[in-house]
């Protein structure tokens, strides 16, 4: 929140972080809605049955004859005798309708997530692809993607020559245009052979990725033999590929997340629901997966488990056992599943492949990128890839206890989700996978780190070392510090040397006259900034080492020009307590972010600048951005603490404790370092 003397508007807590009494109220309303819906369905069934009885009676010849006699019209009597009206079709019996209403699963409304348009990460890299839908939609943000069919590729390639051919183990391929070309009788089929042969003749490298290993190795190995380079999702299969293919151009390529669609941006309603599983049931295949369902899913049914799956008209071998059917809330297409990822507090995962060091469901990467906690059955890949970031349930009681604990622990959920998200954004994005491919080909990879200039004004000599330490500890690089000495009679060279000794190599220290406003000091720093992004940091607040590296990620998935923290922790030194302020403003677009957490594009800061004010300068900037429709994004709550000194005179905003805590939750007594600076 931009700290200013102005009255902040009221902001209700939740639904991101419900207070217990609010959660109980919501649950009561949800129960009442279910009961009203049940009664309505029964009433509608009775009305439909009564209507049918009336129509059926009116359609009978005896009814029409009696009506005609009553009218004393010979013509109508004759017409009634000759009439052959069909009786209307009977509706569902009321008893069946009541039974159905009593056992209907909960109603879950899931919006469709939008696939954003916009730039790709490597517009100068043209890649022709044959991919199934999930990979096709994820990779399209990474390069200039060329999609084609069996017959039109020569014409397309003549107009747009690819730098690389990248194919995965596709069942349908490019929306069905390459269906069954890699598997089945006589596979790989001639069109695929011709395509790869043409690329080889033209000097275009060809890459194949088997995402179906290890169970479907035999289905795709003959296709893999056509390609120059081969990747597998299972690290244990690399030696076998090298043996069969006769070369060592083989490596591992795990699944990944695409931040443009797999990100923590909340739907308006937040995480309304508790726990969910999404997937199919296999009666005859994958016995390990079925066993994990009994371990992971079955004990959680009494916690209000939802299941997204097909129900009703499915083959018996894919039909869910009876005990799970009341929990099935419908089947979701992928664009709705993306929204569902951010509507639940906990997602469950089970595994078909247990012993691979690298092969696990892509959904675990996607959910973690959404900061959604996952509880999973055991697999070697999940254990080695995510460690304790994904809790493992080996016994039913472990599943029950872990899910219940997460449902009841909003602070733990936020912390666990944040750390898992960081792991994926650091190591497991599709950008990382493209880097792996390019490295295998001996081609240069892309530097993704944005340069940041930190503008940090201070008018307190006693805070200079703390301010330098806050910036020096940041793991993000490249990093520039621009410190503005506001009315301080200190040699800028001495301050710059201190910053360099702390490990900051790019330092500029500017003197500023004491009569200048804080806004004017910020503008001095902005004018000297060289970074792609500019951060405003304060000299007294606490910043964790991951503060900037976490915050800058919002530019990978949001359309914001300014990001910051609406939800944030505040430490009240005089009371030795830590509060979570504005908990509902986390992972969502907002016009309320804390002034000490501003991180924006250099272009935006130079276009708008700060007003010539000492108090409320950040609030006025935010208001101008709002008026002009410039998007502001409020990220996570971690790695920043608004420090409220016991001496109120230390702050430009002279607000009392009650005003500062009225939109806050009490978190704990004591300092926040261990919990917040992670």
Predicted feature locations:
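Nucleotide-sugar donor-binding catalytic core of glycosyltransferases
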Residues: 96-160, 169-172, 176-178, 184-191, ...
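C-terminal catalytic/acceptor-binding lobe
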Residues: 418, 608-678
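Short aromatic/hydrophobic "clamp" motif used to bind/position activated sugar donors
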Residues: 534
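A charged, aromatic-enriched C-terminal amphipathic alpha-helix characteristic of glycosyltransferases
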Residues: 411-441
